[in-house]
Amino acid sequence: MIIRSLDLKDFTNYREESLTFHPNINLFVGDNAQGKSNLLDSLYFIATLGSGRSHTDRELVRWGEEGFSLSAAFSNRHGDHQLKIRGGKKKEVRIDGYDIQKKKEYIGYLTVILFTPDDLSLIKGDPSLRRAYMDQELAQTDVEAYVLQLRYRKILEQRNTLLKETWRHGFGQDMDAWEDQLVQKGTRILKKRLELLQLLAPLAQETHASISEGEELKVEYQSKTELEPLLEGREEEFMEAYRKILWKKREEDAQRGFTTRGPHRDDLNLTAGGVSLRKFGSQGQQRTAALSLKLAEIGYLKEKTGEY
């Protein structure tokens, strides 16, 4: 997978810039505040159709302009491609002359690994960051995983809305229906995440050992839902237990106003030498673990796509 060229117009601090890349290694050198990070963000954007730094496309538009454009020529295992993106008020994406209507249509064209100083929070930060790490990695190559994530969030919003209205209507058949969908989609998300870790965890462990004088890194999925039936292939048994948990938690969830069980509440447990890195790891250990996870992504994406 090689990006051959990139044209930027009105993207962050770039008025207009054209770049041609070497097929192997490229180094970007310059003074502070000259646009090195913005250039890297443009590369991240053409791979994911989103920024690694900004929350909205509008924030990426050069000051005083209405929108930005990115054009890239790249090659992957399927051949050569031309990409054109317009962003700002409305996003338009064209690949090889064809309009991309939904992000899922673009998944698999380009993959990217972003490593920044902020990735230390992947180890010591909120569990939501580690969940996002898993889901974003899956969504780079797996269309089904990406669609599942979108659908699960919508179903979760519906259940949470019903929970907040129980004082008025109680628990009715609508709750049963939404919970059934939540169980189905949630189970599939869990399976996807566990499959991801089956590949990623050993790679991270091997990398960590090589850069930390042999210290053992463990990456384990952490859930308040008993996963043993799912791990052993007893999916129906797991789903039935999942339904019962949601049913038992209805009163508590209604009081809190949100769903307290499910993959949206799970976490990764990262330990080195048997010690929790989030709670007790030194900053050096946390940085090494974050780097190990990021380097493991290289092997994972190679396994999934067949190319670097």
Predicted segments with their positions:
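ABC ATPase nucleotide-binding domain signature
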Residues: 25, 43, 117-119, 274
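Intracellular alpha-helical coupling/juxtamembrane segments of multi-pass membrane proteins
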Residues: 60-63, 152-155, 193
